[in-house]
UniProtKB/Swiss-Prot annotation:
Name of the protein this chain belongs to: Elongation factor G, mitochondrial
Organism encoding this protein: Anopheles gambiae (African malaria mosquito)
The protein's annotated pathway: Protein biosynthesis; polypeptide chain elongation
Function in brief: Mitochondrial GTPase that catalyzes the GTP-dependent ribosomal translocation step during translation elongation. During this step, the ribosome changes from the pre-translocational (PRE) to the post-translocational (POST) state as the newly formed A-site-bound peptidyl-tRNA and P-site-bound deacylated tRNA move to the P and E sites, respectively. Catalyzes the coordinated movement of the two tRNA molecules, the mRNA and conformational changes in the ribosome.
InterPro entries xref list: EFG_II, EFG_III, EFG_III/V, EFG_IV, EFG_V, EFG_V-like, EFTu-like_2, G_TR_CS
Superkingdom in the source lineage: Eukaryota
SUPFAM superfamilies the record matches: EF-G C-terminal domain-like (SSF54980), P-loop containing nucleoside triphosphate hydrolases (SSF52540), Ribosomal protein S5 domain 2-like (SSF54211), Translation proteins (SSF50447)
Compartments, as annotated in UniProt: Mitochondrion
C-alpha cells in the first residue's frame, strides 16, 4: 500500500507514519548488513580514564547514527542502563568491564567501535582492543584532564602504533577548563596537539563549538541536539579563534611538509590544505587533533564522527604483518593484504573470548581475505580444524548473522575452542601467526572458596570460564597452606569476579585478605655442576649438568629464560627439554619466602650422560638438584611490585597526603596544582597500599581520590625481606613463632 493509497482511503495519519517507520526500519537494517569498500571502513576504539564519559559518548554515537532508537544513561538511573554496558554488574557500578563491540553507519561509512574499560584493573581489555584497531578516540574529562589511566592508555597506543584524536568531554561540568587539558596533553603525554574546535562557553554557559578549520560556529538544536545549525563565529570569539587557527597551522607545519611550505611562504592555507595536513600527520602519529564537547548534553558528537572519517585511517592505510614461523629459524615478517577482494587466503586473530548462553563466543578481526559461512578454518597454534556454522557481527550483547566477512571486519564465532591471541587461517599450509597480544603478570592474590560446599561444581565452572576469558586472571591450589588462590591486576579485579560468580553461577564465595605477588631473584651469577646418580637394581639414573644461573637485567625481572649453550654430544639433544622442565618446575617456589623465581637465566654449558642409565627424567632431576645447589651457594633477594600512584585532593590536605605516602615508603615523583586542588604522583610498594583508600577518605573529608597501576618489580626493603623469610620459615615449621611460644 502506498502513501497516496492510504490518503485516498482516508486512513489515519498515524497509519501512514507507521508504514513509513517500518520502511525506514527495513531499509536501515539492510544498510547495516551491507559490506562497504575498504576506504569506507573505520575500526576505532574509545579509550580513556575511568569516568571520562566513554560509554555515554558511545551511546550518543549509536543514537545519532540511527543504531538505537533512544538513549539511556550510565549507572542505569532510568533502570535501563547504557547499551554498551550489557553486564548487570556494569549497569550497577557505572563502569565498563568488558569491551563491547558494535558497528554502525555514518555518512555511508561502516564504523566498528570497541568501547573499552577505563579502570586500571581491566587494562588487558584495553590492550586487546587496541591490538585489533586502526585508530582510537582518546576521551579526556575537561575537569580531570590527563589522569593515570590516560597515561596507561597513551603508552598502549604507542606500543601498537595506533593513531588517535582527542575529545575533551564534559564541558558542562563545574570547573571545566579544556585549555588546561590541552596543556597537559602537551606536557604529560608529549603530544603535538592543537585544537581543531573551540568551545562556545563552558559549564552552564556551554552553547556549541567553533570549527577552526572551516571557521564556522556550530549549534546543536532540537531535542537531543539532532539538528546542527551553522552560523558566523560570535564577535567576542573571533580574535581567539583566529589565533587558535594560526596555532593549529603552526603545529601542523612542524610535522607536515606541504602545509609547512605554505606557512613559510606566508600563503593562505585552504580548508582542504588543513584537513589534508591533519589527516597525514595523524596517520603518522605526529599530530593529535583535539575536539571538544559534552556527550551528556548532546553537543559535539556529530563533528567527532566526521573527524573519525576525515582523520583516522581505514584498514588499507595501516600496515599489519604476520610472522612465518619455522623450526630452528627466526620468524619472518610478512605483510598482509587488506584488500576486500578475497584474492588472498583468510588470516584472522582471536582477540577476545566470552562464555555466553550458547557456548564460547570468540571475537576476531579479519586481516586478510574473505571468510564465508560453511568454510573450514585452522588454528595455527593447535592445528585444529573448525567448520563454521555461523558468523555474527556484534552490537553490544546482541548478534546479527552475516554470510561472509572481509579484511578489516570485526566479527565473532560460536563454539570455537581457542585462546586469546590465536591466529586462524583457511589454508593449513600457511604457518602464520599474528604478533601475540602483550599480557601483564598479575600482582595481587587472594584466597577464595565457595561459601557453601554444595556449590563446588558451579565454582569450578566459573573458574574455568573466567581463566579462559581473561589471561590476567589466574587460579591455583597452594598445597602448603591448603588454599585455593586467585590472582589478578588488583583488588577490584578479583572482587568483580567474586560478584560475577554469585550473580551468574549462583555461587557465593568468600575472599581472603589480599596477598602481594612477591618474587625471588639472584643478586649475582652463580655456577653449578651437579651429578644425579642412582642405582637400585635394574636400570639406574645418571645425568650431569653444569653451567651458570645468572640474573636478567632489571627490565626483564618478571621473566625466566633457559638457554642451551652445549657443544658436542655430552648432553644429547633429546634430554634438553627434560632439563628445561626441571628448571621451570623449581622456579615455581623459591627458598627465601616460597614465592616464584623470576629475573633469572639458566645457561646450560656442559654435562655428561650414560648410554644406558640416562633418561629425560634423570636430566630433569639433575636440573632440579642444580637449582637446589644454587639456592645454597647463591645470593638471593625478594622483589616486590611497585605501583604508580596518583592522588588528587584539595590543597589544604597536601601536607597530610604527602606525609601518608612517605609513611608507606613512597617516593614522590611529581606534584602539580590548579584551582584549589593538587595532584601528587608517587611510586609506592603495593604491599604498603592496602587500606589506603579508607585512610585517604578520612584524612581529606571524603574529597580525596587516588588511582594506581603496576609499574615494575624492584628489590624490597631489608626489613620486609626479613619479615617474609621469617613468616615462611614459621609456616614450614622450620622455626618456632616467638609470639605463639609466649601464648603457650
Amino acid at each position: 500500500m502506498t502513501i497516496s493509497n492510504l490518503i485516498r482511503s482516508r486512513c489515519s495519519l498515524a497509519a501512514a507514519k507507521s508504514f513509513l517507520e517500518n520502511v525506514k526500519s527495513f531499509s536501515s537494517h539492510a544498510t547495516f548488513a551491507e559490506h562497504k569498500q575498504l576506504e569506507k571502513i573505520r575500526n576505532i576504539g574509545i579509550s580513556a580514564h575511568i569516568d571520562s564519559g566513554k560509554t555515554t559518548l558511545t551511546e550518543r554515537i549509536l543514537f545519532y547514527t540511527g543504531r538505537i532508537k533512544e538513549m539511556h544513561e550510565v549507572k542505569g538511573k532510568d533502570n535501563v542502563g547504557a547499551t554498551m554496558d550489557s553486564m548487570e554488574l556494569e549497569r550497577q557500578r557505572g563502569i565498563t568491564i568488558q569491551s563491547a563491540a558494535t558497528y554502525t553507519i555514518w555518512k555511508d561509512h561502516n564504523i566498528n567501535i570497541i568501547d573499552t574499560p577505563g579502570h586500571v584493573d581491566f587494562t588487558v581489555e584495553v590492550e586487546r582492543a587496541l591490538r585489533v584497531l586502526d585508530g582510537a578516540v582518546l576521551v579526556l574529562c575537561s575537569v580531570g584532564g590527563v589522569q593515570s589511566q590516560t597515561l596507561t592508555v597513551n603508552r598502549q597506543m604507542k606500543r601498537y602504533n595506533v593513531p588517535c584524536l582527542a575529545f575533551i568531554n564534559k564541558l558542562d561540568r563545574s570547573g571545566a577548563n579544556p585549555y588546561r587539558v590541552l596543556g597537559q596533553m602537551r606536557s604529560k603525554l608529549n603530544h603535538n596537539a592543537a585544537f581543531v574546535q573551540l568551545p562556545i562557553g563552558v559549564e552552564s554557559n556551554c552553547k556549541g563549538v567553533i570549527d577552526l578549520v572551516k571557521q564556522r560556529a556550530l549549534y546543536f538544536e532540537e531535542p537531543y541536539g539532532l539538528k546542527i545549525r551553522e552560523d558566523e563565529i560570535p564577535a567576542d570569539m573571533r580574535t581567539e579563534s583566529a589565533e587558535r587557527r594560526q596555532e593549529l597551522i603552526e603545529h601542523l607545519s612542524n610535522v607536515d611538509e606541504k602545509i609547512g611550505e605554505l606557512f613559510l611562504e606566508e600563503r593562505e592555507a585552504t580548508v582542504e590544505d588543513i584537513m589534508g595536513a591533519i589527516r597525514r600527520s595523524t596517520l603518522k602519529r605526529a599530530f593529535t587533533p583535539v575536539l571538544v564537547g559534552t556527550a551528556l548534553k548532546n553537543k559535539g558528537v556529530q563533528p567527532l564522527l566526521d573527524a573519525v572519517l576525515d582523520y583516522l585511517p581505514h584498514p588499507g592505510e595501516v600496515e599489519n604483518v604476520a610472522l612465518v614461523e619455522k623450526k630452528d629459524e627466526e620468524p619472518q615478517k610478512v605483510p598482509l593484504n587488506p584488500a576486500r577482494d578475497g584474492k588472498d587466503p583468510f588470516v584472522g586473530l582471536a582477540f577476545k573470548l566470552e562464555a555466553g548462553r550458547f557456548g564460547q563466543l570468540t571475537y576476531l578481526r579479519c586481516y586478510q581475505g574473505v571468510l564465508r559461512k560453511g568454510d573450514n578454518i585452522f588454528n595455527t597454534r593447535s592445528g585444529k580444524k573448525i567448520r563454521l556454522a555461523r558468523l555474527v557481527r556484534l552490537h553490544s550483547n546482541q548478534m546479527e548473522d552475516v554470510n561472509e566477512v572481509y579484511a578489516g571486519d570485526i566479527f565473532a564465532l560460536f563454539g570455537v575452542d581457542c585462546a586469546s591471541g590465536d591466529t586462524f587461517v583457511t589454508n593449513p599450509k600457511l604457518e602464520l601467526s599474528m604478533e601475540s597480544i602483550f599480557v601483564p603478570d598479575p600482582v595481587v592474590s587472594m584466597a577464595i572458596k565457595p561459601t557453601n560446599s554444595k556449590d563446588r561444581d558451579n565454582f569450578a565452572k566459573a573458574i574455568a570460564r573466567f581463566t579462559k576469558e581473561d589471561p590476567t586472571f589466574h587460579f591455583e591450589y597452594d598445597a602448603d597452606v591448603k588454599e585455593t588462590l586467585v590472582s589478578g591486576m588488583g583488588e577490584l579485579h578479583l572482587e568483580i569476579y567474586a560478584q560475577r560468580m554469585e550473580r551468574e553461577y549462583n555461587c557465593p564465595v568468600t575472599l581472603g585478605k589480599p596477598k602481594v605477588a612477591f618474587r625471588e631473584t639472584l643478586i649475582g651469577p652463580c655456577e653449578f655442576d651437579y651429578l644425579h646418580k642412582k642405582q637400585s637394581g635394574g636400570q639406574g639414573q645418571y645425568a650431569r649438568v653444569s653451567g651458570i644461573l645468572e640474573p636478567l637485567p632489571p627490565h626483564q625481572n618478571t621473566t625466566i629464560e633457559f638457554v642451551d649453550e652445549t657443544m658436542g654430544t655430552n648432553v644429547p639433544k633429546q634430554f634438553i627439554p627434560g632439563i628445561e622442565k626441571g628448571f621451570r618446575q623449581m622456579a615455581e617456589k623459591g627458598l627465601l619466602s616460597g614465592h616464584k623465581l623470576s629475573g633469572i637465566k639458566f645457561r646450560l654449558q656442559d654435562g655428561a650422560h650414560h648410554i644406558v642409565d640416562s633418561s629425560e627424567l634423570a636430566f630433569m632431576l639433575a636440573a632440579q638438584g642444580a637449582i637446589k645447589s644454587v639456592f645454597e651457594n647463591g645470593s638471593w633477594q625478594i622483589l616486590e611490585p611497585i605501583m604508580m600512584v596518583e592522588v588528587t585532593a584539595p590543597e589544604e590536605f597536601q601536607g597530610t597526603v604527602i606525609g601518608q605516602l612517605n609513611k608507606r615508603h613512597g617516593i614522590i615523583t611529581g606534584t602539580e596544582g590548579a584551582e584549589g586542588w593538587f595532584t601528587v604522583y608517587a611510586e609506592v610498594p603495593l604491599n604498603d597500599m592496602f587500606g589506603y583508600a579508607g585512610e585517604l577518605r578520612s584524612s581529606t573529608q571524603g574529597k580525596g581520590e587516588f588511582s594506581m597501576e603496576y609499574s615494575r618489580y624492584s628489590p624490597c626493603m631489608p626489613e620486609v625481606q626479613e619479615k617474609l623469610c621469617h613468616e615462611y620459615q614459621v609456616s614450614q615449621g622450620l622455626v618456632v613463632d616467638k609470639k605463639q611460644k609466649k601464648k603457650n
